[in-house]
């Protein structure tokens, strides 16, 4: 069965995403996918790639890609949506596994376990022949060969620099090291940055024929793009953030064309002013966190981000959050996504029109 999307649509979607990054789109960016709009063909034997099965190398990359395509056969793409395969299923911060950490998905979710808890003995190197790096690259190559840009493959979720270090040595060990052995933490930061850059370049070279790049957030870019993040920052104060995190984020934003920081949890709001001071950072994704009020309850955060000249990614279904209420103030700075059934299609189309978007 075909993927219901044209080459011309893909060109327009890429161009519109780039205009959004530059602040020239003149409207919000909204990806709206109807997940059950069309019938699928016979289901392939291979499973749909997910955290629970990434360890199963018995399926060839070609078989994995065939199953991923089958999943998308039923989708209709409205607004700024497009066909995409998300490789974040290998876990958040999979660079750690490519540098020696143990990837364990026996619980059904991917977790990473340290390879060396003594920070003075830990040395971080990207291994392009690591089994996880090779597996993901092989799947990327198979997808590029089969789809030739008609379905976009994301960059794997390599992770944030401090988060990768925490996976390699242990979060508690890293916290103690920031106080007891800060010089070792600074060394590890530089090593992790080098490993990250090498991994990014390795995957980017394979994905280059797509003519665009994206990540687990789905925001396309004709140039390089990534999601700098530091979940570790939830556990440290502003002084430590300034010493250990801010400059590595600055370097991230200066190396990559279009960046959006993953601001995860209310504990990170104390760092927001420093994040907004980064001139090359283009956008913020605000995630309040489990048990906290939903996205619609934080208009002051969105307004602060946009007042600093940054775009904002609003999580959750755009129809149920504050994007319409924020539209008069934030307008073209908003990005949101919708995944809906065919029974909801008319409602989705009405929402898109209210946002100034033709379905």
Where are these regions (language model features)?
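A contiguous, low-structure linker/loop signature
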Residues: 84-122
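Active-site loop segments of alpha/beta catalytic cores
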Residues: 1-50, 54, 71, 78-84, ...
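Internal helix-loop-helix
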Residues: 60-63, 67-88
